[in-house]
C-alpha cells in the first residue's frame, strides 16, 4: 500500500500562499486576486466621475457648463473629453500638459482619461472576478463570457473609436445628455443607424429583451404548485429534487403558438446567452469600423437620382439630408477652433426661425 504524504501544515507559508489564503477566504464580499484590479480601479473611476460632474467645468475644452456647481442637473452634468488640440495624450497629472497642477489638469480634461482608463480596467477586473469565483466554486465561466459583451462595447466606443479619430475629443463624454449628443454625432457623421453591425446589435438587445420576457412569463405560467413537503420549493434549498416548472407544458404551449419550441433547457438558455452577447459583440465590431471611417450602405444611385429629380425621394435620401444638417450644425458648434463657416442657405433652421 502506498501512502501519500503531503507537506506538514506547520511549515511556514510563503508570501504568495499567505496572500492567496487571505484574498480567496470565504467572506460576505469575495475579494480574490481579481479584486486587486477591480476595487481600486472601480473606486477611482467612480470617484473621478463624481468629482468631475460635481465641480469641474468643460468651458476650456468644449465651451460648456457640465457640473452641478455651474447649474447642471443629473441629466446634463458630464465628465467631458479633453480638448481636440491634446489629440491622444494620456494627460497624466505629472505630464507635460498639466505639470502637476491639479486644477489645470481638470481644466484640460484629465479627469476623462482618468475615468475612461480606470473604468476600462475596472470592467475587465469585474469579468476576471466572475472567472475567478466560477473557478473557485466549480462553475463554468459563461457569466464572464457574457459580461465581455458590455466590456467590448465600452472599450470600442470610449477607447478604440477616438484612437482611430483625431483624438480623445471625439469620444463620448461621460454623462446622460452627453451620450445622447454622441449618438447624434454617430448618426450624422457615420450614418450609424444604417450600419449592418448596428442592426445586429439592435436585434441582439431587443431580441434578448423579448426572450427574457417570454422566458420569465413562461416559467411563471408553468410553475408547479408549492407542496408541504420538507424538500419542496423552500427558497434557496439546494437539495430540491423536483422541477420548479413544467418544461413539457411550456413546450406544448409554444409549439401550439409558433409551431416550434425549445425542447430542452440547455439549448434554450444557451440561446438566451447567445443573442444579446453576439449582438453586443457585433456592435463593438461596427464601432471599430467607424474608428477607421469605414462606410456601409451608401445607396449612391438613389442619391444621384434624388439630386436629378426633385420629385424622387426615399426614406434613405431624407435621412442623408438629415445627416448633412447634423454635420453642418454640430461641426461648427463642437469644433469652434476650426473656424468652420457655412453659407446661410445650407444651415438648418430651427422652428423659431
Curated annotation (Swiss-Prot):
Keywords from the UniProt entry: Acetylation, Chlorophyll, Chloroplast, Chromophore, Electron transport, Iron, Magnesium, Membrane, Metal-binding, Oxidoreductase, Phosphoprotein, Photosynthesis, Photosystem II, Plastid, Thylakoid, Transmembrane, Transmembrane helix, Transport
GO MF assignments: chlorophyll binding; electron transporter, transferring electrons within the cyclic electron transport pathway of photosynthesis activity; iron ion binding; oxygen evolving activity
Residues holding chlorophyll a PD2: 198
Modification N-acetylthreonine occurs at: 2
GO biological process, one term: photosynthetic electron transport in photosystem II
Entry coiled-coil feature ranges: none
Binding site for chlorophyll a ChlzD2: 118
Coarse class of the protein's main subcellular location: plastid
Keyword Metal-binding: yes
Cofactor details (free text): The D1/D2 heterodimer binds P680, chlorophylls that are the primary electron donor of PSII, and subsequent electron acceptors. It shares a non-heme iron and each subunit binds pheophytin, quinone, additional chlorophylls, carotenoids and lipids. There is also a Cl(-1) ion associated with D1 and D2, which is required for oxygen evolution. The PSII complex binds additional chlorophylls, carotenoids and specific lipids.
Membrane topology of the entry: Multi-pass membrane protein
Catalytic activity field: 2 a plastoquinone + 4 hnu + 2 H2O = 2 a plastoquinol + O2
Binding site for pheophytin a: 130, 143
Binding-site list for a plastoquinone: 215, 262
Organism domain of life: Eukaryota
Subunit structure as annotated in this protein's UniProt entry: PSII is composed of 1 copy each of membrane proteins PsbA, PsbB, PsbC, PsbD, PsbE, PsbF, PsbH, PsbI, PsbJ, PsbK, PsbL, PsbM, PsbT, PsbX, PsbY, PsbZ, Psb30/Ycf12, at least 3 peripheral proteins of the oxygen-evolving complex and a large number of cofactors. It forms dimeric complexes.
The protein's name: Photosystem II D2 protein
Organism phylogeny: Eukaryota, Viridiplantae, Streptophyta, Embryophyta, Tracheophyta
